[in-house]
Amino acid sequence: MPKLVIHQEKVEDPQVLVDICPFGAMEEKDGKLSINAACKMCKLCVKKGPAGAVEYVEDEKKEEIDKSQWNGIAVYVDHVDGEIHPVTYELIGKARELASKINHPVYALFMGNNISDKAEELLHYGVDKVFVYDFPELARFKIESYTSVFEDFIKKHQPCAILTGATTVGRQLAPRVAARMKTGLTADCTILEMDENTDLSQIRPAFGGNIMAHILTPNNRPQMATVRYKVMNAPERTEETHGEIISCAIDKEKIKAHVDVLDIVKKEPEKFIESADVLVVAGRGIKKEEDLAMIRELAELLDGQVACTRPLAEAGWVEAKCQVGLSGRTVRPKPVSYTHLRAHETCADL
C-alpha cells in the first residue's frame, strides 16, 4: 500500500509538521519525526509542509495474477462436534449460484475430528467435492491449527473464492487466513455477485448502514467474504448425491498448536433473535427506558422475543445482540410487530 516517507534532513522545525496534521499522527522525539497509526493518508503534510520534507510514495505496480489458475467456490464448514451450523448450508446455496455463472465447482472444507461420517450430508446440498481433514489435533477449535489447515487447502486446490459464516469461529478464522494468504476479506456481506472474469463483487453496509459499499479484490486470490446467518437462502436437500468426499493428508507438525484446551464450560442455552418466530421490535418512539416494560409484556403474551432498532441499542436500553437492521442482526421471523418506530426508521433486513 502507499506510504509517507519523511526526509529528516529537510525538516528544519518538526513542530510545523506536527501542527499541520489534523489527526495527531505526526510525533516528534529527539528532534526526529515519525508517523503513527492515526495517519489517514490525507497528504496535508505533503501539500502544506516544507518542500520535500514528506513524500507520498505509491506502491510498485503488482504483477497481475493468472485468474485461470484459481478454480472453484469453497465454503468453510462451521460445526461443533460434527453438528453443522445452518449458515454452512446457506453459503453452499450461494456458492452454487456464484459457481454456475463461471462454470466452477463448489467445494466444502470440513476440518475436525471424527467427522468423516458427517461429510456425506454436505453432498445432499449440491457440493461437488468435500475436502475432509479429520485428525485428533483438530478436535477442538485452535486458531493456529485451523489456520494452517486452511492454508494447506488453499495452496493445494486454489479456490477462486471462499465463503465463511460470520459465526464466533468464522470471525476469528477468516481474517487469519486472509492475512496468511495476503488477500482481501470483506466481513458481513449482504450481497455477493460474480462477474464473468471471476471477480467477486462483495457488497455490505458501511457507515452504520447509511451506504452500501461495493468491494472487489481484482488482483488477489482467493477472494474471501464472511456472511451472517439467515442472510442467504439454503437450498433444498436432495436424496441423490453426485459429489465426492476427499480425505486430505497434512504434515502433523503444521497442525501443532502452542495452546491446549484444558476444559470446555458450556453456556446455558440462550435464545437468539435470529431463530425467533415472533419478534416485537421497539424503536426511537420509546422515550423512556421504563416504557420497554409494556414491549416485553407484549412479547411474552405473543410467546416471542423483544428486538430493537439502533437508537435503543446505542442508548443501552436493549442489548446490542437484540438489534435488527443493516447494522444489527439479520432475522426472518414469521409475524413482526413494530412498536413505536419513527417514520425514518427502517429494518431493512427483516
Please identify what each model-predicted range represents.
Residues M1-R342:
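N-terminal glycine-rich FAD/FM-binding segment characteristic of electron-transfer flavoproteins
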